Amino acid sequence: MTFARAVKNKELAYISRLLSIFGVVEERQMRLLFQHLEAKDYGKIMTRLHREGMIYRTPDAKYLAPSELTAMRTDRRNSVLCFWAFIQIRDKAQDFCMGEPPTIITVASKSTDYDLIPLSRENIALINEQVEDMPERSVRYLITDDLKLISGVERRFRNDYVLHIQDDGEIETYEL
């Protein structure tokens, strides 16, 4: 089942849920994720969320967040990179929830779980600590815009991937 079919008529709830998990995303990313909606319908949803105080737009209108405080405190770079990865795997998602740090989100599909983990200098130690605790069937996506960071990551036997994300959302996938 595609993401569009799964969220049909529940887009408002899904947008709120995704913003609460990711913290900050780019406006263009959210529009891309919900591209199945006509512009008019998407606009109505965003207007309603804004009117009810459930969404905050940065002054430059580039980012969306659940609140101004969240927009100021969230690591934008990592949230945006992980959201690009979520867009990439959205059709595999049957359900998703906030992950245990450093994982931002865990996406469940029929046969496996996907953990989207931002790869940064600050996260490497925590990522390496959790390598033994991860179920073997879980796929670990380490998300970065700097491939030099992967040299410090301990590799599992299988199901470890690096998603190298460009500024335009272009994604290159490498097995770790």
Q: What are these language model-derived features?
A:
Residues S16, G43, T47, F86, ...:
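Generic detector of well-ordered alpha-helical segments enriched in charged/polar residues
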Residues R5-L12, A39-G43, D75, S79, ...:
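Short, structured coil/loop segments at alpha-helix boundaries
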Residues M1-M72:
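Nuclease-adjacent, charged terminal/linker segments that flank catalytic cores
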Residues Y114-E170:
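Catalytic cores of nucleic-acid endonucleases
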Residues F3, E27-R28, I89-D91, Y114-D115, ...:
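N-terminal start-of-chain detector that recognizes signal peptides
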Residues F34, M46-H50, A85-A93, V131-M134:
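Hydrophobic, Leu/Ile/Phe/Ala-enriched alpha-helical segments that form helix-helix packing faces
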Residues M1-L18, E154-L176:
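Non-catalytic C-terminal interaction segments of nucleic acid-processing enzymes
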Residues Y14-I21, M54-E129:
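Nucleic-acid-binding surface
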